[in-house]
Amino acid sequence: MTERVKLTGASRRDKLLLWLKESTLPLTGGQLAKQANVSRQVIVQDISLLKAKNEPIIATSQGYVYIDSTGQQQAAEKIVACLHGPERTEEELQLIVDEGVTVKDVIIEHPVYGDLTASLRVGTRKEVQHFMKKINSTNASYLSQLTNGVHLHTLTASDEHRIQQACQALEAAGILITD
């Protein structure tokens, strides 16, 4: 049986960067902690230090992602305004991803803090299910509950037509704000 060696600060952060860069999927703090043989809290601190050094790491509902600016970019991006209650969140996300569109984030305008943005990066029904499961299991509130259901999403897709189709689906469902 092999015993995992606990990595020290700088070497652990180097490994974290390597693991994140090599991964095609988000990695959770728990997964990274297990690989590095440290607590999840140590990983959270390490990620904060890496972000402070301008490493393009984002935290999503599925885990940490390294955003490689040299990687493939989506050809089309659009910010859309939506309005609905919490009970329609899953429907909204599924309408979008069913058109081959990724929901990059959610943005609300807070009266004190200004724009608050949370990364979502949800692009498939499976990712929608994972997001919903996480919201429900943690009893977390949606950001849009702070603004009576009004919120923005940044949508990305391989082409503008997919985003137009998603917008039409949202409008037909009475979710898209058009005025």
What role is predicted for each listed range?
Residues 74-179:
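Mid-protein regulatory/catalytic core that forms ligand/cofactor-binding pockets
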Residues 57-68:
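Minor-groove-contacting beta-hairpin "wing" of winged helix-turn-helix DNA-binding domains
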Residues 26-59:
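N-terminal helix-turn-helix
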Residues 7, 20, 37, 83-84, ...:
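Residue-level marker of alpha-helix boundaries and capping positions
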Residues 30, 60-61, 106, 145:
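Residue-level detector of family-conserved "landmark" positions at structurally sensitive sites
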Residues 1-34:
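Extreme N-terminal segment that seeds HTH/winged-HTH DNA-binding domains in transcriptional regulators
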Residues 14, 18, 45-48, 94, ...:
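Solvent-exposed alpha-helical segments within well-ordered globular domains of core cellular machineries
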